[in-house]
Design a protein with these regions (language model features):
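Anion-binding and metal-coordination hotspots
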Residues: 1-465
Length: 465
């Protein structure tokens, strides 16, 4: 986790800031705000002057600000609006106002919201915008009690050398930014570069025009070029995939590592030569944040091995049966419970034992539900079961995992801290911060390679042997 460059804002600050942004960026919005808004004078700096120790005064203020925000959005976008078509900047400002007007509030007690009575919601929105200054900064949790604001940095690390072979910076929350989701993209070498997202369509158009002008020889040369390594991704000896999860554990969870049998020599050669082949026979290491069925399937499909600490199966009843004590026959599509009773697996991979649980002597160890035990099996349930079984049966897997973990933690500390203090990002948004992360990891790699004897000999970069 990397701290963002802006202050986290409360709901009142966000509402006022979003209205002011609309006034600045939307043509004619200042007049609309003056005509529609009654809760606050948005031309005045600072927060409203109320008794902030009075809960009733605060709730009335929240109601007034939300009502103002909804009125402005309706006036600018509703049917019969006299406003001109909004450009991209103006539309983004109005969309942000609509978002902050709804993400933190709920109708007051006894209200459905139509009477203009609102209150701060007793929950946190899953993908809450925490600042109108940096709209991509997010809340996340490293544990139940350790909450952070900012961004997630994901690293591909080779633990034997400490080299970082790929990296990505994402928002801290959201399923697409989880540890395992980013790791799967790294495995496939398809992590999108935020710096290129705005140019994707233009690049595709230019590519189409170029292809139409090429003759057969040019296309053959292009095909040969495309088969060569590009130098922008995990190298053959050490692709490792980072990931992020909304409820991660510690800093080391941001790195997934991969090694080969002769990883040190191969990594050094690949790094100096600039190769980025994915390579065969890699072993990927990660903690339980990476233990999803989808990631395990991606690693297997890519022809690699996974040494990823699995999350233990949890019983529905304390001390009772876990999922692993139910037998699943994928061929026949059936599930058998610990009491030996069998049910058919539904097309969406759920099963309910229902009436079979009524007179079951093992019921108290299985479920407290009146409708009996039910299961929801993952698409890759077989891989998850095998991982848990292998981890429990083979102590060497845990030893191998623990052997590499300290080196990974050291790499994370080098990226996330400087002078013993955690780094605070200096930019807003994923694009600029991702560029910063790439420069930082490149500098750390260069320092690492120089320490290993990197030198220039006869015009070529070489490593001392």
């Amino acid at each position: 986790m990397l701290d963002d460059a802006v202050a986290t804002q409360d709901t009142v600050t966000q509402l006022i800031g979003a209205v002011r942004r609309v006034a600045r960026q939307v043509p004619g919005a200042a007049a609309v705000i003056a005509a529609e808004c009654r809760g606050h004078d948005y031309t005045q700096p600072g927060k409203p002057r109320i008794d902030w120790t009075d809960p009733q005064a605060k709730q009335e203020l929240v109601s007034a600000l939300v009502t103002d925000a909804n009125a402005v959005v309706a006036a600018l976008t509703g049917a019969g609006s006299d406003q001109v078509e909004l450009d991209e900047t103006a539309a983004a400002a109005v969309a942000l106002l609509a978002l902050v007007a709804g993400q933190d509030v709920e109708p007051a007690e006894g209200s459905d919201g139509r009477d203009g009575r609102w209150r701060i919601a007793r929950r946190v929105a899953p993908d809450r915008v925490i600042s109108t200054v940096d709209e991509q900064a997010r809340h996340t949790r490293k544990s139940q009690h350790n909450r952070k604001d900012g961004y997630r940095a994901h690293l591909v690390n080779e633990p034997g050398t400490g080299l970082i072979t790929d990296e990505a910076l994402t928002m801290a929350a959201g399923p697409d930014n989880s540890d395992a989701a980013i790791a799967a993209r790294f495995v496939a070498n398809t992590v999108p570069n935020p710096n290129n997202q705005d140019r994707d369509e233009q690049d595709r158009d230019e590519q189409d025009r170029d292809e139409q002008d090429r003759d057969e020889q040019d296309r053959d040369e292009q095909d040969r070029d495309e088969q060569a390594p590009s130098g922008d991704g995990p190298i053959a000896a050490d692709p490792a995939a980072p990931g992020t999860d909304d409820a991660g554990t510690d800093d080391a969870d941001c790195v997934l590592t991969a090694v080969t049998d002769d990883h040190e020599g191969a990594v050094a050669a690949g790094a100096v030569a600039g190769g980025n082949g994915q390579g065969e026979g890699l072993t990927w290491y990660g903690d339980s944040a990476y233990g999803t069925g989808d990631l395990r399937a991606a690693i297997k499909q890519a022809g690699h091995d996974a040494v990823i600490k699995p999350k233990p199966a949890q019983p529905a009843v304390p001390g009772g049966f876990t999922l692993d004590e139910f037998s699943v026959d994928e061929d026949s599509g059936t599930v058998t419970c610990p009491a030996g009773r069998t049910r058919q697996l539904s097309p969406n991979r759920t099963v309910t034992f229902g009436v079979l649980c009524r007179d079951c002597p093992l019921r108290t160890r299985c479920t407290t539900s009146k409708t009996g035990r039910s299961l929801d099996l993952h698409e890759h349930d077989a891989l998850l079961r095998a991982a848990r079984a292998d981890w429990a049966a083979d102590p060497a897997l845990g030893e191998d995992y623990r052997h590499h973990r300290p080196n990974v933690e050291r790499t994370v500390a080098q990226v996330a801290t400087q002078g013993g203090r955690r780094i605070k990002l200096r930019h807003r948004g994923t694009v600029k911060n991702n560029a910063w992360l790439k420069r930082r990891t490149a500098a750390l790699n260069l320092r690492n390679l120089i320490g290993r004897g990197l030198a220039r000999l006869d015009g070529t970069w070489v490593l001392a042997t």
